[in-house]
Amino acid sequence: MRILTIILFLMLVPCFCLSQMKTGAFSDLETSQKGNPKPIIIHIYTDWCSVCKIEKYNLSKDKELIKKINEDFYFINFEAEKTKDKINFLGQEFNYLPNGNSGIHELALALSKNKSQPVYPLWIVLDKDKNLIYYHEGEFKPEKMKAKLLEISAL
């Protein structure tokens, strides 16, 4: 019985791993782009954003979308108010801007069209050369995201 339990466990573990979105970091982007250039998806969110949590749950259920993102894009999840690391991106250095007990990262402000207070969640898609090709504020429903990413992949 114990062996059967172990075998079943080992069979199920890959299923959970295969359905997860692969996320990267800005620090790895330059190396990744040199070896295998792909468009880049930057997802900017905060941990207090309820829309962000709903969106994350809905996206995690769409295995086809996760597969598309993992195969054809580099995906960066960026927590705008908790990320305190210095980030070099597009030839510039961006830092965390503390403001009392909280703060925001300069990169979130730089990528947002609303420079005073970004809207969360924020989705930015860059081409292989890091040019902006799509910008989306607010919830990005899986069906709309799939259609947009298919359109971008066809470019």
Language model features: what each stretch is:
Residues 1-22:
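Bacterial Sec-dependent N-terminal signal peptides
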Residues 22-23, 66-102:
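Thiol-based oxidoreductase modules, predominantly thioredoxin-like and allied folds used
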Residues 106, 119-135:
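A short, hydrophobic beta-strand/beta-hairpin element that forms part of a small beta-sheet core
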Residues 40-43, 75-78, 122-125:
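Structural recognition of the beta-strand scaffold that forms the well-ordered cores
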Residues 35-50:
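Short active-site neighborhood of thiol/selenol oxidoreductases, capturing the structured segment around
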Residues 47-54, 122:
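C-type cytochrome heme c attachment motif
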Residues 20-36:
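N-terminal leader/targeting and pre-domain segments
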Residues 53-70:
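Typically the conserved alpha-helix immediately C-terminal to a functionally engaged Cys/Sec
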